[in-house]
């Protein structure tokens, strides 16, 4: 397949549109079903790079959930806890394959943002993963292959129009990449940098105890950031990104945004949320919306008289600010990555409130001393990588 003709570009008025190889070679992808769009393919190609690098760095199957050219979640395939099964809506599926676990966690980190996602998988899509994808609202999927049964399940999705893409896992892009803006061609070297253990050796804090589990989480954070629109910050725990702040002009707003997402992920594990008495007829996306409102400042949108009766069997108690603060204090050992240096210690202070213990950032700010002092005040472990990871 040398080119794919698209319905339109970013917007319906941007026609004609297609993707192709400038050198005339075949594309490294094959469309097995559906008709992916321009943004779908941007998500697919960025997401594939992310999961293939996660697999290489950790040795575990990996998945990511992309929306508008940034990941909403990314994870490796470790076993789900019973609570994770509940908050990801998969407790009825029994034991899942490692790849399905990876997608459940990638999708479940920020379910509001992942609605209508494009999925990338590091490994051949199996039946467990296909059954999980079948239940979710999603635009498409890319993987290095599909079992016959998994492919049939996916082909039936969206009335037979679900986009299914197979990628050549051995494809390596040219060393030089190009893109055009306003008719002007930009050229740069492809970002082949690998995130490995050596990148975290320069620990600048008093506490230098970096366990293997935290090292893996920091690698996941930086690999995720490598394919996230800048500025970006990523919180990771237990092999999964739990809060990604993408595309913000200020570093502190990245840290706040990602931190609020990480907080929401942890609040969903609280007894107050796990025991919400949903009506049996409430669908998965509506539950996600209700939970998002319930744990936020607009909780009366679901608890007001005339509202809660449409969602719950009985009216839940308000999840008070004091209760939320007490629950969030239990979230610990979170890892944090940043695609560029923290200019002020306020980023560290905000990260600490979301349970951050381990930090990886390039360093190089004129106020590095202030940032290190803030990290030391909370007994954090912080590595300076010397590596900026801007992505646009």
For the regions a protein language model found, what residue spans apply to each?
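C-terminal binding/interaction regions
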Residues: 117, 121-122, 135-165, 170-172, ...
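Conserved helix-loop functional segments at active or binding sites
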Residues: 53, 227, 264-268, 353, ...
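Active-site-proximal loop/turn and secondary-structure-junction residues that shape catalytic pockets
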Residues: 70, 125, 237-240, 342, ...
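Flexible, glycine/charged-enriched surface loops at secondary-structure junctions
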Residues: 57-65, 164-167, 230-237, 267-279, ...
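Active-site loops and adjacent core secondary-structure elements that bind or stabilize anionic groups
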Residues: 1-199, 214-232
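Gly-rich Lys/Arg/Thr-decorated short loops/hinges at beta-loop-alpha junctions or inter-strand turns
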Residues: 23-35, 109-115, 189-208, 286-307, ...
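Glycine- and Gly-Pro-enriched alpha-helical subdomains that act as flexible
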Residues: 72-111, 242-341, 345
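Alpha-helix N-cap/helix-initiation motif
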Residues: 36, 40, 247, 340, ...
């Amino acid at each position: 397949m040398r080119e794919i003709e698209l319905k339109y570009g970013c917007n319906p008025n941007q026609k004609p549109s297609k993707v192709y190889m400038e050198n005339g070679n075949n594309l490294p992808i094959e469309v097995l079903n559906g008709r992916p769009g321009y943004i779908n393919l941007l998500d697919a190609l960025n997401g594939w790079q992310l999961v293939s690098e996660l697999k290489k760095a950790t040795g575990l199957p990996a998945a990511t959930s992309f929306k508008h050219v940034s990941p909403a979640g990314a994870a490796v395939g470790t076993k789900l806890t019973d609570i994770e099964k509940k908050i990801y809506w998969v407790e009825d599926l029994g034991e899942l394959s490692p790849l399905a676990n990876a997608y459940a966690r990638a999708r479940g980190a920020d379910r509001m943002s992942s609605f209508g996602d494009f999925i990338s998988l590091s490994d051949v899509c199996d039946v467990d993963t296909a059954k999980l994808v079948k239940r979710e609202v999603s635009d498409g999927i890319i993987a290095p292959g599909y079992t016959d049964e998994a492919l049939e399940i996916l082909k039936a999705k969206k009335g037979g129009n679900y986009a299914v893409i197979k990628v050549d896992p051995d494809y390596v892009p040219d060393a030089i990449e190009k893109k055009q803006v306003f008719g002007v061609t930009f050229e740069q070297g492809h970002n082949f940098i690998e995130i490995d253990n050596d990148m975290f050796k320069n620990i600048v804090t008093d506490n230098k105890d970096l366990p293997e589990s935290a090292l893996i989480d920091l690698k996941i954070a930086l690999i995720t950031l490598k394919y996230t629109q800048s500025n970006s910050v990523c919180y990771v725990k237990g092999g999964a990104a739990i809060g990604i702040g993408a595309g913000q002009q200020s570093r502190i707003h990245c840290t706040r945004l990602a931190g609020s997402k990480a907080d929401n992920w942890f609040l969903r594990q609280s007894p107050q949320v796990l025991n919400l008495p949903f009506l049996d007829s409430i669908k998965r996306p509506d539950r996600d919306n209700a939970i998002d409102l319930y744990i936020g400042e607009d909780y009366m949108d679901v608890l007001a008289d005339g509202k809660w009766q449409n969602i719950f069997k009985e009216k839940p108690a308000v999840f008070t600010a004091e209760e939320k603060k007490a629950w969030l204090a239990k979230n610990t050992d979170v890892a944090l990555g940043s695609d560029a240096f923290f200019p002020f210690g306020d980023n560290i202070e905000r990260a600490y409130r979301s349970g951050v213990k381990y930090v990886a950032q390039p360093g190089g700010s004129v106020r590095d001393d202030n940032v290190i002092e803030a990290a030391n005040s909370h007994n954090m472990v912080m590595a300076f990588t010397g590596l900026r990871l801007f992505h646009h």
